Curated annotation (Swiss-Prot):
Glycosylation sites (chain numbering): 151
Species the sequence originates in: Tityus trivittatus
Cofactor(s) needed for function: Zn(2+)
A Pfam family that the UniProt record links to this protein: Reprolysin_5
Protein's name in the database: Venom metalloproteinase antarease-like TtrivMP_A
Disulfide links within the chain: 295-386
Entry-linked PROSITE patterns: ADAM_MEPRO
Principal cellular location given in the protein's record: secreted
Peptidase M12B domain residues: 162-390
Active site: 320
Class in the EC hierarchy, top level: hydrolase
E.C. no: 3.4.24.-
Length: 394
């Protein structure tokens, strides 16, 4: 048994909220012989042109969730990594588009009246802007007993692909925001298509795969959620307590997707933060994850909050994922990573504005060179065995 102490480190980030600026548009869509879709429209002072490629590989071969037509969903997923677009394009009937256009714009069918022009349904463009500061936390594990790397069953081979597999669980507060499992799955799929776009900025060829989603309700929520809920108001969690409980829960319940996956993420619509003496909670934390926890059954957990309707936490999920892949915050040294010999990120100041820093233009949707080096280092270690797969297997 490995015993450890977890140190919690915080970094200020910003969240995004709808600005109130919206516009109704009729996008044009053209499909080339190669299958690339070009979407064009003008809205909110932006001339948008996207070159979208199929991204159905985001869903694993055996993606699992109840009451969802997975193959139909797979055909609808498109992305433009250059512009950060992650969209569901439905051509069964009048064409509809929903999802992330770029860092500032979201698109969805305009349901009020179902206006149709030249066979195209009207769409609503919503602008999101950076808002109040929140915090990210990472649990750095100081192990008292070193792991034996010789016990790793499979090492990476030259022709392997790097594929990070995710199992997503949602708490009842997040689940009840959606009318159906299908609507929830659409939202989560767009979210992780956006994560793939951000992972591409590492230039390490890392693929993102969703193995499945379990949408908990009030009756089915596991003990690590129920037992650690602070009643508030509002209902909330203490992040370091929750990540410890979640990690222990899945350490003791290594079955099915929880066993097979590389990372397990809880998405919650409840807040996270520090309890006050009066019983309320200072909501200040967007996400938390275990440092370098990938492939470790008892440490491969991460948590992200999302109480929006417009997929504004894609960057949080990418940020927490990279903590799990061995990167600290920019500006932090190797002592903030649970990987012996890690180069750390002290040479990349947080003020440079990358995803693992304080997120400012022009770098706020990219990872720093230090983050890349840290992830590369973890990928070189035997303990990262689980994310290497034969390319024909996915």
């Amino acid at each position: 048994m490995i015993s450890y102490l977890a140190s919690i480190f915080l970094l200020a980030t910003v969240s995004a909220v709808p600005s109130g600026r919206v516009e109704v548009v009729f996008p044009s869509v053209e499909t080339s012989r190669s299958g690339v879709k070009t979407v064009k429209f003008t809205a909110l002072d932006q001339n948008v042109e996207l070159k979208l490629r199929s991204a159905g590989e985001i869903l694993g071969k055996h993606f699992a969730i109840q009451d969802v037509d997975v193959e139909s969903l797979r055909r609808k997923i498109y992305r433009d990594s250059v512009n950060g677009a992650a969209l569901l394009i439905d051509e069964d009937g009048p064409l509809t588009i929903e999802g992330i256009v770029n860092s500032k714009l979201r698109i969805q069918p305009f349901e009020s009246g179902r206006i149709i022009k030249d066979g195209m349904i009207a769409h609503q463009i919503v602008e999101v802007i950076d808002d109040k500061k929140s915090y990210d936390r990472v649990a750095v594990i100081h192990e008292n007993v070193k792991r034996n790397a010789e016990n790793v069953s499979r090492m990476a081979e030259e022709n392997d692909c790097i594929v990070v597999e995710y199992y997503i669980v949602t708490d009842s507060a997040f689940t009840k925001r959606f009318k159906s499992n299908s609507a929830l799955t659409n939202y989560v799929t767009v979210m992780f298509t956006g994560v793939q776009n951000l992972m591409d900025t590492l230039e390490l060829g890392i693929g993102v795969r969703l193995l499945g989603v379990t949408a908990f309700n009030e009756e089915t929520e596991p003990s690590f959620i129920k037992d650690n809920l602070i009643p508030g108001p509002p209902e909330a969690f203490e992040p370091d307590v929750l990540i410890t409980a979640m990690s222990q829960y899945y350490c003791n319940h290594q079955t099915g997707l929880a066993k097979d996956t590389d990372l397990i993420f809880l998405i919650t619509a409840r807040g996270m933060g520090d309890p006050r003496e009066d019983g309320t909670v200072d909501i200040n934390t967007a996400g938390i994850a275990n440092s370098a926890g990938v492939c470790k059954p008892c440490l491969k957990a991460g948590i992200a909050t999302d109480d929006s309707n417009y997929n504004e936490r894609v960057d949080t999920l990418a940020h927490e994922s990279v903590h799990l892949l061995g990167s600290p915050h920019d500006g932090e040294g190797p002592d903030q990573v649970s990987v012996e010999g890690s180069p750390g990120a002290a040479n990349c100041p947080a003020k440079a504005g990358y995803i693992m820093g304080n997120r400012k233009d022009p770098n706020k949707y990219k990872f720093s060179p230090c983050t890349k080096k840290c992830v590369e280092y973890l990928l070189s270690k035997p303990t990262a065995f689980c994310i290497f797969e034969q390319c024909s297997d996915f």
